[in-house]
Amino acid sequence: MLNVNKYAALVAVVLLLVSCFEKKQEPLVAPWGVIDDTVTVAEDFDLHDIQTSGELIMATVTGPETYYDYHGKSLGTQYLLCQRFADSLGCRLRVDVCRDSIELVHKLDSCEADLIAWPTPGHIEADRSKPDLVAELKSWYHPSFIDDVKKEETALLTTKKVRRRIFAPMLDAKGGIISHYDQYFMTYSRDIRWDWRLMAAQCYQESTFDPKAVSFAGAKGLMQIMPGTADHLGVARSKLYEPEANIVAAAKYIGELQRTFSDIRDQYERTNFVLASYNGGAHHIRDAMALAKRDGKNPHRWSDVSAYVLKLATPKYYNDPIVKYGYMRGSETVDYVNRIRQRHASYQGVKSAHMGFHPSQPRKADQRKKKYDI
C-alpha cells in the first residue's frame, strides 16, 4: 500500500496515484470515509502503456488550486505540476473534470484516470498496482517544483495579459475619428445590429486598437480571437493579424453569442451578457444565471447576474450542484463589461465613421507611440 499523504507537497494538496485492480481489493480510505470498491479491471495499465498511448489523464475538480480555464489557458497549481510531469514523460496531459471527490475516487478505481487531484488535504491510501508510474513520479519530483509552478501561475495572473502598443482611445475627437478601423466597425457591426461605436469600445478594451496584439493564451489581433475560435468561424489563422479579417471573426462570434442568449429579449441586457461571455465564456455566465434564478433574482438582468459572476470565485458557489462549469475569476469579466459600457458612452458624440481615413495608413503621430506590456 502507498501512503500518498507524505507526498502531499507534490501538489500542495493531495495527489493520488492511479490504481487499476485485477480483482477486488481493500476499500479506499479517504478523508470523507470509506469508498466502496467493487470495480474489476482485467488488465494493468502502467507507465509503458501510458507513454505508448501518448496521453496522461488527470482527473480533478475545478478550483483555483486544482484546475480552471482562464481566457483560454488552463491554470491551477496541480494542473501546472501535472503538465510538467506529463512533459517529462513525453505525453500530452488530458484533464477530466469531475463533479466531486467521490467521482474522483471512482475514476481512479475504474482506471479512467492516471492521476487524481483535489483541494482537500487528508490521508489517502491506494493499492500500488502501477509501480512504474509511482517510481517515475517519485524520481521526477523535487520540492522546488511547487514554488516554481506557483511563481509561473502568479506571473501569468499578475502581468498584463496582452502584449500590445498603446494607442489613444480616441484618434481624433474633433475630426470624429475613433480609430483607424472605424469603417470596418461600421460595416460589420450592421451584421450583428450593434452600434459601431460599441464594437470600437470593445476593440479598445481587447487590444487598444493594436492589430498585432497577442495575449499570453494565444489570442490575436484587434478583437483578440483565439486560433481555435478562428477555425470554428471559418477564418484562416494566418489572417488574424489582418484588421478586417479579425473584425469579421469577432462579428461572427458575437452573432453566435447573441443567438446563444436569444432568451434574453431586452437587447441592451442581452448585449451585456454577450460581452461577458466574450470575455469569460458563455458556460460560466449560464452558471451565474442559474444561481441568480435559484435565489429569486432575475436571470435576464445583468445587474443581478453579475453579482453571481463574482461569486463564482468562491467555493460555496463554484462547488454548488447547480454550477456545471466550476470556478471563474469573475471580477475581470464584470470589470470588462463595465469598462466597455463606459467607453461606449464616451464615444456617443461621434456621429459617423470618418470616410477619408484608410486603416492601412496610420498617421505619423502614431509612430511616436512606444511599445508596452499592458
Language model features with spans:
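Extended ligand-binding regions for polar small-molecule ligands
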Residues: F21-V41, L47-H48, G76-S88, I124-K160, ...
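Low-complexity, Gly/Ser/Thr/Pro-rich intrinsically disordered linker/tail segments
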Residues: E332-I374
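Export/targeting segments at the very N-terminus of extracytoplasmic proteins
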Residues: D37-T38, K160-F209, E244-I247, S262-R265, ...
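Periplasmic-binding protein-like
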Residues: T62, P121-S139, R165-P169, V309-K316
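Substrate-binding/active-site groove segments that recognize
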Residues: K212-S238, N246-E256, I340
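C-terminal motif of bacterial Sec signal peptides marking the signal peptidase cleavage site
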Residues: L17-S19
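Extracytoplasmic small-molecule ligand-binding "clamshell" domains
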Residues: E26-P27, P31-P119, F185
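Catalytic and substrate-binding regions of cell-wall glycan-acting enzymes that process beta-1,4-linked
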Residues: I124-A126, N272-S346
